[in-house]
Amino acid sequence: MNLQLGFEVELNQSFDQAIDTVTAALKTQGFGVLTRIDVQATLKEKINADFRPYVILGACNPSLAHQALSTDPRIGLLLPCNVTVEAVDNRRSLVRLTDPGAMVNLSEKANEMQELASLGHQKMAAVAAVLQAI
């Protein structure tokens, strides 16, 4: 499913397996995972709230990030690209991937970065396609 800000894919995989699958799919398009926020553990620790298994992965394609930051350093406010993985149940997980193209459009220099926006969109769409094929 194509969302306004990204893509959404449901996987028939456990939460932990889905995280590994998403990480591998991101690598196929040059994205690495820079950060991993365990939302469930953080909410439990900070406010003693129970929450379903949910992680936010900070994904970065160094080449795209370099080009974007060189054009508009303020784009760093939107980096890295967030990818969320959440458990639907024990056998299914929901993945949402930020569309780098949509992020670039928030920049005051969006017109200068349209080619980059298109490339970022294509790469993340390819990641979503890899996941949908599973």
Could you describe each region identified by the protein language model?
Residues 1-29:
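Terminal, regulation- and interaction-focused segments at domain boundaries
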Residues 2-3, 27, 49-52, 88:
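Short glycine-enriched loop/turn motifs at secondary-structure junctions
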Residues 8-10, 21-23, 34, 41, ...:
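Amphipathic alpha-helical hairpins
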Residues 28, 45-46, 130:
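Residues at alpha-helix termini
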Residues 32, 38-84:
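Compact, glycine-rich, soluble single-domain proteins
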Residues 84-110:
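Beta-strand/loop substructures that line and gate deep hydrophobic ligand-binding cavities in soluble
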Residues 105-134:
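Well-ordered alpha/beta subsegment
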